[in-house]
Swiss-Prot record:
Keywords: Chromatin regulator, Methyltransferase, Nucleus, Repeat, S-adenosyl-L-methionine, Transcription, Transcription regulation, Transferase. Residues 14-335 form the DOT1 domain. Its main location: nucleus. PANTHER family: HISTONE H3 METHYLTRANSFERASE, HISTONE-LYSINE N-METHYLTRANSFERASE, H3 LYSINE-79 SPECIFIC. SUPFAM superfamilies: S-adenosyl-L-methionine-dependent methyltransferases. Belongs to the class I-like SAM-binding methyltransferase superfamily. DOT1 family. In contrast to other lysine histone methyltransferases, it does not contain a SET domain, suggesting the existence of another mechanism for methylation of lysine residues of histones. It is an enzyme of class 2 (transferase). This is Histone-lysine N-methyltransferase, H3 lysine-79 specific. The gene is dot1.
Length: 335
């Protein structure tokens, strides 16, 4: 058993059994210890203390790599002990708190590290349960990966005081990422039972992990059920700033039913989807004047390889902004 210190305001340690997993894809405690130390040194340590961790000859990280190369458990334990003592000293003298106070947005590697810790402890051991979906229905499971999601947050300008909603939120990855990376109020709705159960496990672990890392995330809300019928989701959509809909595998019927909900969304709300709700050649005309899609101004964007879980290749996504001005202008032009 090895204890690795977190950089928060309490006496929190993560406990690790130094075992080698049978399967190469299973959780590797030694790798996680190294990654925790790497992440802490990059995000929590003031510049004037960085050399103790980063020095290429004598730094904690270099000594840790040397211990691994020597396959020496005693050497490894000694380095982790020195790391723990350094973190405790910096925590007590206020250096870590000062560093955190100057950080206004978490960088993506830290976000990914925390999300990976959560996922590996909750979803990974039970991932087989997610394979029980039906092709050709709306209940096909697939994940948008953290780097792609971070790009979406930047493209939409999502801010901490805003509201994010993920319709079809699966195991809750994106809901948690929005609350962690942006610090905003974050909602998700999912109807697949297995995914919902894993999402709730992730949410519990998320709260514990944020405490360990000394981070105050936005509030998360995970709702079980049909997002077209759940009243809490219908209500939050009216005040949402950014809505994510991974509609890659949705049936045309569900996509059409979703469109009617756009009427109640506020001006300026941005809807991000993998399939556009507005046909490419669509124009506002007198015969389609009452169509909800006339309220949407759409821009197309590209995502690159390794952005989604179901394919390695890139693709396109769409950001639709609710903007009634074009419809008003057309109506006025008709007299």
């Amino acid at each position: 058993m090895v204890l690795a210190r977190f950089a928060n305001e309490s006496t929190s340690y993560n406990r690790y059994n130094l075992v080698v997993p049978r399967d190469k894809d299973d959780f590797r405690p030694i790798d996680d210890i190294f990654q925790v130390i790497e992440t802490v040194s990059q995000n929590y340590i003031p510049e004037d203390e960085a050399d103790y961790f980063d020095n290429e000859s004598t730094g904690i990280k270099r000594r840790l790599r040397r211990a691994l190369a020597h396959a020496s458990e005693a050497e490894f334990r000694n380095v982790v002990t020195d790391y723990n003592e350094a973190i405790e000293r910096l925590r007590r003298d206020g250096s870590i708190a000062q560093k955190l106070d100057s950080t206004h947005r978490l960088n993506l590697p830290l976000v990914e590290r925390i999300l990976t810790q959560i996922y590996s402890r909750t979803v990974s051991p039970r991932v087989e349960s997610l394979r029980q979906y039906e092709n050709g229905t709306d209940n096909v499971y697939g994940e948008l990966l953290p780097r792609f999601i971070s790009t979406i947050f930047k493209e939409t300008g999502l801010k901490s005081g805003q509201v994010f909603v993920d319709l079809g939120s699966g195991v809750g990855n994106v809901v948690l990422q929005a609350a962690l990376e942006i610090g905003c109020e974050s909602w998700g709705c999912e109807m697949m039972q297995n995914a919902c159960e894993l999402a709730e496990l992730q949410q519990t672990e998320f709260r514990a992990r944020c405490r360990l890392w000394g981070i105050a995330p936005g509030k998360t809300h995970l709702v079980r059920g049909d997002f077209l019928k759940e009243q809490s989701i219908i209500d939050v959509l009216k005040r949402a700033d950014v809505i994510l809909i991974n509609n890659q595998a949705f049936t045309p019927q569900l996509n059409n039913e979703l469109i009617n909900h756009f009427l109640d969304m506020k001006e300026g709300c941005q809807i991000v989807s993998l399939k556009s709700f507005v046909p490419a050649a669509h124009k506002i005309q007198s015969r389609n004047l009452n169509s909800p899609i006339n309220l949407l101004k759409v821009k197309q964007r590209e995502y690159w390889s390794n952005s989604v879980s179901w394919t390695d290749v890139g693709g396109t996504y769409f950001i639709a902004t609710k903007d009634s001005s074009r419809l008003r202008a057309f109506a006025e032009s008709m007299g």
